[in-house]
Amino acid sequence: MIKGISETLGMPIDNWGETQSDRDYNAYNFSYKSVFGLEDERLPQFVKLETALGSYSFPTRKLEIGNYIGDYLEEVGRTDLVETFGLFKFLMKVQALERTYIDKVFALCDYYIQGKSKRYSRHLYDIYKLSPMMKLDEAFSELIKETRAHRAKMTICPSAQDGVNVPDVIKEFCDKEFYKEDYHAITNYFSADVVAYEEVINNMRKIAESGVFDSFQSIGNGKSR
């Protein structure tokens, strides 16, 4: 099915040989040629489609989805064009920001454990921007536990496994400046609202010291540590 979509779009999957149907996780790179003739390793010439078995969104909320073009056309009274091109707002079930935030913290830990930094420092920026929206209460702590248990079922999520101290992993990649080079090369290049590396790292240290990620998975004998 995915290959058929690629052919219909005229966007060859340039890493097709690296994917396998029996994997929990796959990433398909739908390649394209920039109309501007832009060639920069910081902006890969492909759209990445990621698939993961056993991963599902929770909790979810219904939000109104719109787009800039549709909003503009409504503002200038061209609802005829909005209707012609199907640009009206609609409701969509989306994953709660709290879950996205938690996933990003675990993802940074996963990539550090796996020794992968390239193009992943963007999570530092996202977490920084989302942090003021988070309420670190009991419900949030419970969602962390549920998310960790869910991620622990997937082999690509090592930081969710039993015995891994997430706050320690966060402090370690902060101390070693693991994401610093990538952050300066990628995140600052694309973002119009630049946030200094030191600020996003200080934010991660606060998360590590907050205590909300201190919970551990239960281990064999039913105890937790």
What is each stretch, according to the model?
Residues 1-225:
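Structured mid-to-C-terminal alpha-helical surface segments
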